[in-house]
Structures are given as C-alpha cells and as structure tokens.
Amino acid sequence: MAIKALSYIGVNSDKFEDWSDYSQKNLGMQQVDRGKDILSFRMDDQKQRLTITGDKGDNLGFLGWEVEKKEDLSFFASKLEKNKIEVHQAKSSFADMRFVEDLIYFDDPQGNRIELAYNPMSDTDPFKPGRPISGFKTGALGMGHAVVHVKKSMI
C-alpha cells in the first residue's frame, strides 16, 4: 500500500490571465482547458496536472496524490477513518472531472483538501510545452513536491 506520486494540484483563484501567462511562459505547461470557471494545464502525457478553479481566494484548492493500486484507496480510507478523519468516496462524475478512474478525499487537520486518486488518464495528444524546454521529466515521477504551511500548534 503506497502513495506513488503527487499527481495534480488545484488552486483557487479567479486570476485566469495571470495563471495562464505564468503557467505557460514560466513553467512551460500546456493549457488544455479554459471555461468560465476552470483553467487546466498539462506538463506531460497526463491529461491534467494543474487546475485553477475560478474560486476567489488565491489559495490551495486541493492536492491529488496517486496511489499504486485501486485497493489502496480502501486501505487508506480505513486508516484515516480509524483516526477519526472523515473520508468521502468520490462519485464517478467527480473522478471524471479529475481525469482519474477513482478517488477518495478528506481534509487534513489544517483544513487542506487531500485527494487520493487511482489511475490518472493519459492524453493521446503529445505534450506541447508553453515555451521551449528540455530535460522536462515527470510521468511516473509525478509533479514533484508540495509544501503546505500549517500552524505551529499543528506540528
């Protein structure tokens, strides 16, 4: 039972132009979706790595962690519930929105939304970086790292 990689990140922000510019020109991401309330980006063959929700706040919306096996979702849900953390099973329509086969979600003690996802979808179209880039490796390694600030009393 293992968490394999940081699969995707969601940010609450209504500054779509700023995020579009920054993600493509600075991070080299490919913008893949733009709607009234959502902005999405790729950084490899995975369908979606970064989502801007359109909600006000300019803060973390969610962190999505990939698990190795579908059974890992039940394993982690059980562990969390034993520690009195409320876990939710996502409906298939919600999993589709995240481009994963299945997922559970919960809030950490600081109130950050954490999602554990199984089998992220790949895109059949090749990744097209937003700027010239080389040596860009993600894939099975995921997005990299995430640092989440917590109150000192939480440590």
Positions of predicted regions on the chain:
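Short amphipathic beta-strand starts and helix->beta connectors
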Residues: 46-50, 129-131
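Core segments of cupin and vicinal oxygen chelate
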Residues: 1-48, 149-155
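Short acidic/glycine-enriched loop/turn segments that link adjacent beta-strands
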Residues: 35-38, 59, 97-100
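A structural feature that tracks compact, well-ordered secondary-structure segments
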Residues: 22, 29-32, 51-55, 62-66, ...
